[in-house]
From Swiss-Prot:
The record's account of how the chain is modified after translation: Acetylation at Lys-112 and Lys-215 by KAT8 prevents inhibitory binding to SIRT1 and increases its deacetylase activity.
Subunit structure: Component of the DBIRD complex. Interacts with ZNF326/ZIRD; the interaction is direct. Interacts (via N-terminus) with SIRT1, which inhibits the deacetylation of substrates. Interacts (via N-terminus) with SUV39H1; this interaction abolishes the interaction with SIRT1. Component of a nuclear receptor-mediated transcription complex composed of at least ZNF335, CCAR2 and EMSY; the complex stimulates the transcription of nuclear receptor target genes such as SOX9 and HOXA1. Within the complex interacts with EMSY and interacts with ZNF335 (via C-terminus).
GO BP terms in the entry: DNA damage response; mitochondrial fragmentation involved in apoptotic process; mRNA processing; negative regulation of catalytic activity; negative regulation of cell growth; negative regulation of DNA-templated transcription; negative regulation of intrinsic apoptotic signaling pathway in response to DNA damage; negative regulation of proteasomal ubiquitin-dependent protein catabolic process
Region ranges (Disordered): 1-39, 178-219, 280-307, 446-508, 567-638
Sequence positions bearing N6-methyllysine: K123
InterPro entries hit by this protein: BURAN, CCAR1/CCAR2, DBC1/CARP1_inactive_NUDIX_dom, EF-hand-dom_pair, LAIKA, S1-like_RNA-bd_dom
Biased composition (Polar residues): 473-491
Species this chain originates from: Mus musculus
Gene coding for it: Ccar2
Protein name per the record: Cell cycle and apoptosis regulator protein 2
Location of the protein in the cell: Nucleus; Cytoplasm; Cytoplasm, Cytoskeleton, Spindle
Residues carrying N6-acetyllysine: K112, K215
Length: 922
């Protein structure tokens, strides 16, 4: 080292020194007593490397080589012991991983150096004529390199240049086996002190003859995430503390008392909420005039003691959900765009109050709605109809069902104290949807009204010119106000376009001041642009919990109908060997975990803190605690070991000595994956060889596929065993952990349910063959609660026979038949709509074919005319040719005698000349 300090390294032959202001080197301060030339113009890729990290990976030129050490680019010192492969020669290109230590005399020291194989012929440093470096270039790391005499295009560059990053993710790094331990930190940096461990592991791997996984292309997978609450969704009441426990990011008002979850009795497990009917609600544009409904928005005798509000649900219908799910299942070989999640397709129509999205509804009016809301349930329904018509322009009076979804209670302080109750209804909006004929007539009427009329326009222009100035100012202020409102709506609501066109299918049109917000935008969006009220957020969470319970119960009934999986007992010798291998692997993992550096520990802590809000809200699965779930750990020891191996960022083996050790040493910040993302990559590679232990003849219903898709937030195509067990445990039917494990084992292989590879059919699975005590879990074994009602028991108010015109009518049976007929009607309407689209497409094709035929016919006529013209031109040319030929023959006949006459004259002249010449004398 002292020799290196005293020695002044000469630059590479052929280089030039330039004077100027010294700038900081790309890799930090230069080594002590060295005066390397510093690059002044850094490329875009070089600027990307200035991120302040302690290690860099780059390619450079060996500028000095001695007995025990060398120098790369006159800045990076390396010992010959860190060279992998053959020793580099002076002037050769090498791949270097350097570490920065400001405490040493030479700050930049190489950790690994590798000579690049198959290098093209470099310039010889002796002849100066081959040096073609530009005058403004200086040598340094990633600066000017010696020019190549031969630069064939078939040799790709080592690091492809991109506008945003210098290093591209290598395609040689794969996670194709669960027993391939990663040895890189959470940010993709290789640990300097563990290079020997890498080499020893690789040598053992190769010596043992263990085959490497098949080389597969890297997939940009979405992180695995599930829509799942960490609590049971059967609590009938939530107070202040319960809301804070469930939704930690929710701001609860100070006057809030409690909320009663009425949807538990309105939609029991046996009669869940149906998404079968499409109900489309669209907000009209600002240009359309709102119809005068005649309803009073705020009467004088309004009483805040009772308020009635409605949840106006906009849903595409069950057939559209099935279509998206089947597209996702059918596109396994050639994946296309990921369809929208059901939470993004389900939307609520909300009103606005001081630029805040609020529920549609208002306070109770005794004079307009009724006198006693407690005794007469129709009073608050009238309030909801009146307020909804005044705020949205939608008439809900023809809705046939009004379900109580929730009841909010607020305490008004002051003498005397008052209890304010807000009742939220969920009406069947699909019953007020216009039919196809009505919708077509409405669209035609709007198109006729929107057509410009020149006579009326001119008359309006004349009237505007004769109007007084006061009316002009009033119109201007009104237009400015409407423009400001429209601008605010565009800035706040991201779901609505600037001027939404009328939908192709029937829809209910609402007023412009309303807004459509999806459940995903309310519940999942962590940075909402919309100011949402407290009640809207709570109702959205409750609606998602209701869907979670219904879809989870659908999975539960499907699992009950599947045959049990027969598990053969393991042999004692193999079991003992497997236990010994597991103990050895655990010890190896613990030893590797102890060697993790402080930087990696801090980075892991940061990643864990960033994921903690998601885990608290139930968006990411939490690891089981060591104290409270010892039995669950004992049952799923193998599954937890695999998950820990997938989550550990320090257990990765690289495939090649030369390429893979440097290929992923510096990853882009955007490609640094979270714990869930790394886990999804590990599982995706293992899913390809997963044995399908389910009976191939087993066909699941489509609603089960929709249930799987609902819980799979990012369309990964699979669900974990632990998440499926939690889905069953949160239904409220009091299953034990062992029961949930046995049910989930019917569709799980290797701790993962790959639901995308299962078979599905439209035929629904009948639940008649399942006994009631099995359908409702262990509720019959538990002591009855205060209300003593099963969640699957339907309300008994309308049961029995009803006399009508001297006969008894079974109302329940009639309603069931009406539901079946309505379902068939909706299915046929969907098929008719699909056939109409296909017919329209065929019509368009036929029209395009006709246009093409006409174009081809016109072109053929034009070609025929051109052909006739060419034939006429050919005939004219033939006539001219014949005429010229005759003239040439005539000229020949005339010129032949002249030629003979001239020849005779020449001969006669020659004879005369010969006679006149004197004879020579002797």
């Amino acid at each position: 080292m002292s020799q290196f300090k005293r020695q002044r390294i000469n630059p590479l032959p052929g280089g030039r020194n330039f004077s100027g202001a010294a700038s900081t080197s790309l890799l930090g301060p230069p080594p002590g007593l060295l005066t390397p030339p510093v690059a002044t113009d850094l490329s875009q890729n070089a600027r990307h490397l200035q991120s302040g990290e302690k290690q860099r990976v780059f390619t450079g030129i060996v500028t000095s080589l001695h007995d025990y050490f060398g120098v790369v680019d006159e800045e990076v010192f390396f010992q010959l012991s860190v060279v992998k492969g053959r020793l580099p020669q002076l002037g050769e290109k090498v791949l270097v991983k350097a570490a920065y230590n400001p405490g040493q005399a030479v700050p930049w020291n190489a950790v690994k150096v590798q000579t690049l194989s198959n290098q093209p012929l470099l310039k010889s440093p002796a002849p100066p004529l081959l040096h073609v470096a530009a005058l403004g270039q200086k040598q340094g790391i990633l600066g000017a390199q010696p020019q190549l005499i031969f630069q064939p295009h078939r040799i790709p560059p080592l690091f492809p240049q991109k506008p945003l990053s210098l290093f591209q993710t290598s395609h040689t790094l794969h996670l194709s086996h669960l027993n391939r331990f990663p040895a890189r930190g959470p940010h993709g940096r290789l640990d300097q002190g563990r290079s020997d461990d890498y080499d020893s592991k690789k040598r053992k791997q190769r010596a043992g003859g263990e085959p490497w996984g098949a080389k597969k292309p890297r997939h940009d997978l979405s992180p695995y995430r599930v829509h799942l609450t960490p609590y049971t969704v059967d609590s009938p009441t939530c107070d202040f503390l319960e809301l804070q426990r469930r939704y930690r990011s929710l701001l609860v008002p100070s006057d809030f008392l409690s909320v009663h979850l009425s949807w538990l009795s309105a939609f029991p497990l046996g009669q869940p909420f149906s998404l079968h009917h499409p109900s489309r609600i669209q907000v009209s544009s600002e240009k359309e005039a709102a119809p005068d409904t005649g309803a009073e928005p705020s009467p004088e005798d309004s009483d805040p003691t009772y308020s009635s509000k409605v949840l106006l649900l906009s849903s595409p219908g069950l057939e559209e959900f099935y279509r998206c799910c089947m597209l996702f299942v059918d596109d396994m070989a050639e994946p296309r765009e990921t369809p929208e999640h059901p939470l993004k397709q389900l939307k609520f129509l909300l009103g606005r109050k001081e630029e805040e999205a609020v529920l549609v509804g208002g306070e109770w009016s005794p004079s307009l709605d009724g006198l006693d809301p407690q005794a007469d349930p129709q009073v608050l329904v009238r309030t909801a109809i009146r307020c909804a018509q005044a705020q949205t322009g939608i008439d809900l009076s023809t809705c046939t069902k009004w379900w109580r979804f929730a009841e909010f209670q607020y305490l008004q302080p002051g003498p005397p104290r008052q209890l304010h109750t807000v009742v939220v209804y969920l009406p069947d909006v699909w019953t007020i949807m216009p039919t196809l004929e009505e919708w077509e007539a409405l669209c035609q009427q709007k198109a006729t009204e929107a057509a410009p009329q020149p006579h009326e326009a001119s008359g309006e222009a004349e009237a505007t010119e004769q109007a007084p100035d006061v009316s002009e100012q009033a119109d201007t202020s009104k237009q400015n106000t409407e423009t400001m409102e429209a601008t605010t709506q565009q800035d706040v609501d991201t779901d609505l376009p600037e001027a939404p066109p009328p939908p192709l299918e029937p829809a209910v049109m609402a007023r412009p001041r309303c807004v459509n917000l999806s459940l995903y935008g309310i519940v999942e969006d962590r940075r909402p642009k919309e100011r949402i009220s407290f009640e809207v957020v709570v109702l959205a969470e409750l609606f998602v919990e209701m869907l979670q319970r219904d879809f989870g119960y659908r999975i539960y009934k499907t699992l009950l109908s599947l045959p049990e999986k027969v598990v053969s007992p393991p042999e004692p010798e193999k079991e003992e060997a497997a236990k010994e291998d597991a103990v050895k692997e655990e010890e190896a993992v613990k030893e590797e975990a102890v060697k993790v550096s402080k930087d990696e520990v801090q980075n892991e802590g940061t990643a864990a803190e960033s994921d903690s809000p998601l885990k608290e809200d139930g968006l990411l699965p939490k690891r089981p605690s060591s104290g409270g779930e010892e039995e669950e750990k004992a049952r799923g020891e193998a599954a937890e070991d695999l998950c820990e191996m997938a989550l550990d960022p320090d257990l990765l083996l690289l495939r090649d000595d030369g390429e893979d050790e440097f290929a992923g040493a510096k990853l882009e910040e955007t490609e640094v994956r979270s714990v869930a993302s790394n886990q999804s990559e590990m599982e995706y590679s293992s899913l390809q060889d997963m044995p399908k232990e389910l009976d191939p003849s087993t066909v699941l219903p489509l609603d089960c596929l929709l249930a799987f898709v609902f819980f799979d937030a990012n369309w990964c195509g699979y669900l974990h065993r632990r998440d499926l067990e939690r889905v069953l445990l949160t239904l409220g039917i009091r299953l034990s952990a062992e029961q949930a494990k046995q049910l989930v084992s019917r569709v799980v292989a290797q701790n993962i349910c790959q639901y995308r590879s299962l078979q599905y059919s439209r035929a629904e699975v009948l639940d008649d063959g399942l006994p009631e005590d099995v359908l409702f879990g262990n509720l019959d074994l538990l002591p009855p609660s205060g209300k003593s009602t099963k969640p699957g028991a339907a309300p008994t108010e309308h049961k029995g026979l009803v006399p009508h015109n001297g006969s008894l009518i079974n109302v329940g049976s009639l309603l069931q038949r009406a539901e079946q007929q309505d379902s068939g009607r909706l299915y046929l309407e969907n098929k008719i709509h699909t056939l109409e689209l296909k017919l329209e497409e065929s019509h368009n094709r036929f029209s395009a074919t006709e246009v093409t035929n006409k174009t081809l016919a016109a072109e053929m006529q034009e070609l025929r005319a051109r052909l006739a013209e060419a034939e006429e031109t050919a005939r004219t040319a033939e006539r001219q040719k014949n005429q010229l030929q005759r003239q040439m023959q005539d000229f020949r006949r005339r010129l032949t005698p002249l030629h003979l006459e001239m020849q005779r004259i020449v001969e006669k002249a020659d004879s005369w000349v010969e006679k006149e010449e004197p004879t020579p004398s002797n």
